[in-house]
Amino acid sequence: MTERDELLSAIESIGVGEGAAERIPLDELLRGLYPVPSQARVFHLDKILIIGGRGTGKTQIFRALLSDRGREAVVRATGVKLIHDVRKMVMIEAFSAGSAANAQVPLHPAADAIEDVVQDDDVGATRRLWLGVCLARLGLHPSALALLPASDQAALVQLGNAAASARELRAWVDADVERPFAILDALDRAATGRGLACIFTFDALDRAANRWDTLGLLVGGLLSLALDISRRHRSIRLKIFLRPDLESDAAKGFPDASKLRGYREELHWERGDLYRLAFYPLCSKCREVWQGPLLKWDRPTTKEKK
């Protein structure tokens, strides 16, 4: 096979795969990962709202956050300096599309079940559902759970078994609304004492409900909760990946929405990054053909750009 044939074959195979970041096996996702600086800034603890339209890499970077290898790969590739060591981040997948990244834990609550629980409620009531979601997923995360007293661990393990049920999660919080905050306070003290950061991640929120008005209510409640937790705790954050249209609608739902601007990161691609992204998989397929400088994908310096 000639060099030309090798290149054509590599180009034809670029698009092969599942085509959706949530379904691609982790090894494949990391192999094709080409992060940009705005994606790496997602790792800053106080960036609690991540905005990006379709195709900007929200789900890809969301999944990278959940992996030790993924976090280190993103920071190493972009060169963005972080205040917090990514190795000391305890990432907890709080909500995503249907199945969890860990196939051994319960699925996320279904949209119909969520709608049934929050219908006719206000933003304050939806916060309780999201509190239940966070605490249930905490109960399914061994390393985060180990930071808590034994009595809290036992309660959360039981709650974790009901993580797929929106009704049970909401009822658990409604039974004693002070209990989840007391547990989070204890988690914050333990994490701070060990130099750790516990981060609850949320993605695919457009699939949390089937009706647009319910989505606005749910996202508004989640953003309100995330803002309050960032004020109350030193080492606990909610990190929410959101489409611009959902952000706009949800911002109307609670009075402090304007204060989220300082906690916001928008995923942005420069034109040069798009060109590099186009050639990156081609280069990966042709390692035996292209050797040397073409395999080095460092971003140009300011001087080189000129």
Predicted segment positions?
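P-loop NTPase nucleotide-binding core
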Residues: 46-47, 53-198, 208-213
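Pre-Walker A-like glycine/lysine-rich segment at the N-terminus of P-loop NTPase domains
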Residues: 31, 37-55
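Active-site-adjacent bridging/hinge elements
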Residues: 30-38, 99-111, 195-202, 250-255, ...
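The catalytic "switch" region of P-loop NTPases
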Residues: 181, 186-190, 197-199, 205-306
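Short, flexible loop/turn elements at secondary-structure junctions
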Residues: 3, 11, 15-18, 52-55, ...
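Extended alpha-helical coiled-coil/bundle linker/stalk regions that scaffold oligomerization
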Residues: 5-18, 191-200, 306
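Generic structural signal for hydrophobic core residues of well-folded globular domains
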Residues: 14, 33, 37, 65, ...
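N-terminal pre-Walker A segment at the start of P-loop NTPase domains
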Residues: 2-39
